[in-house]
Every structure is written in C-alpha cells, then in structure tokens.
C-alpha cells in the first residue's frame, strides 16, 4: 500500500510541472495566431461563435453588435460578411434570444452585402461565398434557484454539450491542418459577455486547446473576447472574475474596473 501511494505521489510531482507549463502556454496572450490570409479568403472561411445569455445579456450583446455593424467610423465598423459562418449559442428554453439572433442576422447580412456592392469591393454577393449561420441550443449550466448541490451535474452536462458544439464542424482527418476550401472549422473567435453558459463554453475551449484536439491550439483557433456587462460599474461579475486570466481579451466599459489588478482587463469605453 505504501509503495502504491509513493508511486502515485512521485508521478504527481513529475507530471504537475509539465501540466502547469502546458496550461501557461495555451493561456499566454502571445499564443499562436491563426495562419490566415484575410477574413475574406474563400479557402479559409472565418467562423464566429457568439454566446447569448438571456434578458440583459442578450440585449447588451445585440446592442453591441448592432452598434458595430452600423458604425459610420470605418475603424470601428464590423462587416458581418467577413465572418463566413456564425454560430449563435443559446440556453435551453430561451426562445426569445433565438428570435433576436434571427432578427439581427436579417438586418446585418443584407446591410454588409449592400455596402460591399456600393463600395465596389465585390461584383456580386456570391463572390465572397454564401455565408450562413446556425442557432445551437445547449443545456443550462445552472437553472434559476437551482440548489448548489446539483449544479455540478448540470454544469457537466453543459460542458459536454459545449465540447461537442465546438467540435461539430471538425473531422478526424484534419489534425494540424487548416480547413479545406469552403469548410467550417473550429470557431476562430468566441465572443461572450457573462452568462454562466459562456464560462462553461470557454472552459471547454481551454480543455480542447490544452490537448490540442485536432490541431486547434497549434492553428490558433478559438481565441476568446469577453465583454463585461455595462451594468458592472464597480466590481466584476463572477463570470468575469473566473475568466479574466483565461480569455485572450477582457474588455470593460467603466474606467474604474480597469484599475482592478486582475487578469487582462482593458477599458474601451461604452460598447453597447
């Protein structure tokens, strides 16, 4: 018995430094950037994943995106067609967020296409590929008023669903290689603003990158941007505190929050 315990302790001491080093590599701000030749390259379609919470989280996310796609400032404007495929993630039972996502797509996609045509960037809409979006439902990480005792079970179900979602458009034959022309790959960018589901999904992306599943870490996939809620004026949310050292960029909308010496906080003004 003593021999087994000693062996386990020795293995732990030997592997722990390597595991910590690996975690440091995938979480460093200077980690591998995607090997791309422009977001509009049809051979390298860009995949954007957006996480919607419910109520205020959804309203803020869509307000932020609406402001970006309609901005008159070219430096701040977001061309929606630059993202060949968009995945909207919602929680079970949140039909309102699903409808809001559809409404946004109906507004943003024609707007970006028309502006490209007027600017002479493309001859016709099909020159940059048809693009498309999907709305995917995952189990809630935790229901309202759900006992903390059962929260780990629901969180694990959410984690498993998020892992499957992130790998949905990948194949076993793509290890270490970029997507084939026109294929959708791992998300290139994950955009979130605080719901519990976002925390679980970001954790799932970290686990996949830790083990470099299908070359996702080597190829710089699943870079994450977290935008703290406008309602958070003096203190970060629980999701924010958990993710401030994990995401690639962490944006706050109040200058006093940027003074918190926690993680990678950046103040970029009001974004909603």
Map each language-model feature to its residues.
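Terminal signal-anchor or tail-anchor transmembrane helices
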Residues: 1-29
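Phosphate-coordination/substrate-recognition cap region in phosphate-metabolizing enzymes
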Residues: 98
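Active-site and donor-binding regions of nucleotide-sugar-utilizing enzymes
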Residues: 14, 51-52, 56-84, 92-93, ...
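N-terminal signal-anchor transmembrane helix
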Residues: 26-50, 59
């Amino acid at each position: 018995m003593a021999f087994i315990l000693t062996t386990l302790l020795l293995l732990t001491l030997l592997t722990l430094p390597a595991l910590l080093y690996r975690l440091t590599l995938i979480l460093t701000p200077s980690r591998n950037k995607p090997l791309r030749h422009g977001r509009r390259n049809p051979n390298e379609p860009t995949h954007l994943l957006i996480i919607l919470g419910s109520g205020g989280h959804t309203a803020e996310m869509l307000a932020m995106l609406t402001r970006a796609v309609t901005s008159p400032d070219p430096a701040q404007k977001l061309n929606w067609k630059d993202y060949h495929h968009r995945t909207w993630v919602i929680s079970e039972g949140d039909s309102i967020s699903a409808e809001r996502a559809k409404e946004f797509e109906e507004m943003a996609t024609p707007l970006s296409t028309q502006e490209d045509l007027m600017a002479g960037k493309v001859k016709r809409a099909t020159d940059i590929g048809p693009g498309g979006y999907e709305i995917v439902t995952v189990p809630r990480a935790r229901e309202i008023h759900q006992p903390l005792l059962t929260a780990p079970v629901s969180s694990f179900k959410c984690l498993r669903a998020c892992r499957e979602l992130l790998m949905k458009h990948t194949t076993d034959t793509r290890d270490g290689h970029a997507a084939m022309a026109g294929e959708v790959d791992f998300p290139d960018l994950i955009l979130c603003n605080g719901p519990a589901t976002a925390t679980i999904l970001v954790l799932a992306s970290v686990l996949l990158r830790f083990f470099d599943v299908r070359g996702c870490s080597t190829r710089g996939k699943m870079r994450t941007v977290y935008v703290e809620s406008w309602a958070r004026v003096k203190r970060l949310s629980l999701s924010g505190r958990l993710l401030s050292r994990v995401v690639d960029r962490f944006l706050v909308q109040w200058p006093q929050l940027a003074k918190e010496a926690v993680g990678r906080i950046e103040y970029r003004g009001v974004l909603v």
